[in-house]
């Protein structure tokens, strides 16, 4: 899983 996607998910949550 890419850190960029994780950052986006964290931003949404």
From Swiss-Prot:
A single Gene Ontology CC term: extracellular region
Leucine amide, modified sites: 13
Tissues/organs with expression: Expressed by the skin glands.
Compartments where found: Secreted
UniProtKB keywords: Amidation, Amphibian defense peptide, Antibiotic, Antimicrobial, Secreted
Disulfide bridge map: none
The keyword Ribonucleoprotein is annotated on this UniProt entry: no
Domain of life the protein comes from: Eukaryota
Main subcellular location of this protein, as a coarse class: secreted
GO process terms (BP): defense response to bacterium
Function: Antimicrobial peptide.
Family classification: Belongs to the frog skin active peptide (FSAP) family. Temporin subfamily.
Record-given protein name: Temporin-1LT
Natural source organism: Rana latastei
């Amino acid at each position: 899983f890419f850190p960029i996607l994780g950052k986006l998910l964290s931003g949404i949550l």
